[in-house]
Amino acid sequence: MGEYIQIVEYESDDIDAVIEAANSVPIPDGVPKPTSVTVVRDRDRPGMYATILRFNSYEDAMAHSDSDATHERIAKISPLTKGDRRFYNLDVLNETTS
């Protein structure tokens, strides 16, 4: 299968702390890394953010998700977010770039 994107949507009063906490946990060698990670703010809903993670494959994403580093990252981020996180798990079917 092709590329895979996971979007994690969440609410926070301190996005800088969320980003700092996420970046404080390195991904060890041997664990698949996202090809890109983008943090975005929802202009229509103050305090709502999403992290967009792109992987080479679904399998890479699942191996990354199962890693101890990811569990540690989630433990650091969770107290900085409010309510439930929403996950979007997306297979890339087509992409056009300019």
Q: What does each of the following model-derived ranges do?
A:
Residues 1-68, 80-98:
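Short S/T/G/P-rich N-terminal loop/turn motif that feeds into the first structured element of a domain
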Residues 71-76:
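Low-complexity, intrinsically disordered Gly/Pro/Thr-rich segments
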